[in-house]
């Protein structure tokens, strides 16, 4: 009887822990999807020479990438964040072509 109670307790504990972790993984995926979407928009505008609009989308992508990285620590996301920051910095200087390259590199990591 004790063995059954221990198993039941262990199962309940495992299910409880899983239910706490699953929402954070789902939120990380949502933020990552938003980061990817904004990064693609940044790239499209960068290819058209619109550095200011690229920066706007890269900043939105960065916000979501940071939230995704907080929810689920990932080296690829961190690298994507680094490139998004470079895209923003370069885009603010009006260099759309170079900023686009950084945004494309970020997309490859997100």
Question: Which residue ranges define each predicted feature?
Answer:
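Long, charged/polar, soluble alpha-helical segments
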Residues: 2-6, 21-110
């Amino acid at each position: 009887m004790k063995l059954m109670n221990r198993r039941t307790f262990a199962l309940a504990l495992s299910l409880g822990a899983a239910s706490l972790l699953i929402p954070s993984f789902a939120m990380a995926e949502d933020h990552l999807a938003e980061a990817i979407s904004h990064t693609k928009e940044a790239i499209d505008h960068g290819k058209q020479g619109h550095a200011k609009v690229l920066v706007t989308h890269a900043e939105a992508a960065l916000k979501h990438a940071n939230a995704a990285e907080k929810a689920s620590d990932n080296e690829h996301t961190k690298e994507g964040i680094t490139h998004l920051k470079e895209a923003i910095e370069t885009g603010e200087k009006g260099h759309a072509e170079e900023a686009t390259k950084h945004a494309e590199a970020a997309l490859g990591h997100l």
